[in-house]
C-alpha cells in the first residue's frame, strides 16, 4: 500500500523483488542502482542480521512527473529467498504495491520456484489481496545458463495470472530495466485509478 506524505506532496510506492535464494533478486537491485541516474536514486541500504540480508533503496524517477499533484518515489526491496526466512519475507512483503518475482530458469530449480511462487500467493491472500489482481511482473532469470527450461514451461508453472514476463540475465542487465519499467507503470496505473 502506497504511503502518502502530505507535507512533502509525495507518494512512496514499494516494489518487492521476490523469489528463491540466489535467483538474482539482489543482482537486479545492484544493477538498477548502478545504472540509474545518481540524482534519481538514494543510497543502497542493507539490513543484515546474523544469517540474512535485505536490501532496499529509494528511486525517484523524475521523468515520471506527478500523479494527482504528488511526486512519486519508489522503494525497491529484496527479500531473503532461503526457506527458513519466511517471516522476513512476509514482513518485507507487507505494504507492497507491486512484486517482481525473479525465477531461476534452471530446470533443477523449478520445484523451488513453484514453492516460492505458491508461498507468495498464500501470503498475498493472508494480507487480503487477490493474487490474480495484484500487480505482478515475472522475470525468467539466468537465461544464459545451460539446462534452462523453455519459457512456455516457466509460463505454464509460474504464471497462472498471465502477468507480464521477461527473459533476463540480471548479471549483465538484460531484462532488468524492462521488468522494473513494467512494475513502475503497473503501479502508476493503479495509483491513477485511486
Residue ranges with predicted function:
Residues 44-84:
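Switch I (G2) and immediately adjacent beta-strands of P-loop GTPase domains
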Residues 8, 52-55, 65-70, 90-95, ...:
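Conserved catalytic network of the ASCE P-loop NTPase/AAA+ motor domain
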Amino acid at each position: 500500500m502506497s504511503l502518502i506524505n502530505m507535507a512533502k506532496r509525495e507518494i512512496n510506492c514499494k516494489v518487492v523483488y521476490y523469489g528463491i535464494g540466489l535467483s538474482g533478486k539482489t543482482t537486479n537491485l545492484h544493477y538498477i542502482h548502478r545504472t540509474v541516474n545518481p540524482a534519481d536514486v538514494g543510497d543502497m541500504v542493507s539490513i543484515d542480521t546474523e544469517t540474512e540480508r535485505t536490501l532496499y533503496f529509494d528511486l525517484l524517477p523524475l521523468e515520471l512527473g506527478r500523479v494527482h499533484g504528488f511526486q512519486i518515489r519508489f522503494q525497491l526491496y529484496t527479500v531473503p529467498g532461503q526457506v527458513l526466512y519466511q517471516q522476513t519475507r512476509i514482513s518485507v512483503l507487507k505494504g507492497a504495491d507491486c512484486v517482481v518475482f525473479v525465477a531461476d530458469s534452471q530446470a533443477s530449480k523449478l520445484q523451488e520456484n513453484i514453492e516460492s511462487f505458491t508461498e507468495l500467493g498464500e501470503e498475498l491472500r493472508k494480507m487480503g489481496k487477490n493474487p490474480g489482481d495484484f500487480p505482478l511482473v515475472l522475470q525468467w532469470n539466468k537465461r544464459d545458463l545451460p539446462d534452462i527450461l523453455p519459457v512456455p514451461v516457466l509460463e505454464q508453472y509460474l504464471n497462472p495470472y498471465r502477468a507480464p514476463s521477461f527473459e533476463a540475465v540480471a548479471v549483465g542487465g538484460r531484462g532488468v530495466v524492462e521488468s522494473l519499467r513494467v512494475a513502475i507503470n503497473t503501479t502508476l496505473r493503479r495509483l491513477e485509478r485511486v
